[in-house]
Amino acid sequence: MLTDKQKEKLNEFRDVFIEYPIISTVFNDFDRLRLGKGLAGEKPCMLLNGDTGTGKTALIKQYKERYLPQFINGVMNHPVLVSRIPSNPTLESTLAELLKDLGQLGSTERKLRINGTRLTTSLIKCLKTCGTELIIIDEFQELIEHNQGKKRREIANRLKYINDEAGVSIVLVGMPWAEKIADEPQWSSRLLVRRQLPYFKLSENPKHFVQLIIGLANRMPFTEKPNLSEQATVFALFSLSKGCFRTLKYFLDDAVLYALMDNAKTLTTKHLV
């Protein structure tokens, strides 16, 4: 059994976020889009995709925490709005989800009885009032998977309209097939920034994977930091995870748990078996 202190240390490690090169690049993209809010001209949008386990949700959460809502002159300022495409989305449910995540008062059920035009007007007004500088919409593949033709174009057109009228850049985040949104004429030229979160590949950038392992090792809750950067260990961890960040992190979370239960001073190879 773990002591309360050990549980606290384990939870801290489970919540660790490592910013490796592609993450830094995406954060810089977000910053440029957000800071463009006060400039003239069209507001460019961005498409960010990656397979399951590449860290999309953790990345979004980390960026949002850098710009949390706060009261300014009696108004709740909401610089970064993070939302998602609901399952089997309609125009109304998509807009209602954005309003809900912006902190708009009233139940989603009540809003769904309001037509899309009124929802759009309300959302644009709230975005301006709240000083929103960037909208990040996760799970965008839901729009691709469940909507074809007219309904998908309707939602895509409305998001484009919000981008124009509110003057806020929008980041669309999803699985690789979310790229199909670029087939829509109204979005093909609007997505000026496109990034992909890939799995790690030792054949291309081995140092990035090694740096990630070192970063995780340095944040492990032990008096002696483990050495996980030896070639044999790196290859073993890569073979186990297949370059997937989530798989690697889950494995190391368990290894840290076993080491804490063992009251070990550091993580050793026996905890990695």
Question: What do the predicted segments below correspond to?
Answer:
Residues 1-4, 27, 31, 90-97, ...:
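Mid-core helix/loop region of P-loop NTP-binding domains shared across ATPases and GTPases
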Residues 2-11, 53, 202-205, 210-273:
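C-terminal alpha-helical "lid" subdomain
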Residues 41-61:
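Walker A/P-loop nucleotide-binding motif
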Residues 61-65, 249:
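The feature captures the helix immediately C-terminal to the Walker
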Residues 65-76, 104-107:
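Post-Walker A helix-loop "phosphate-sensing" segment adjacent to the P-loop in P-loop NTPases
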Residues 78-89:
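A short hydrophobic beta-strand->loop->alpha-helix junction that borders the nucleotide-binding pocket
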Residues 144, 156-228, 232:
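The catalytic "switch" region of P-loop NTPases
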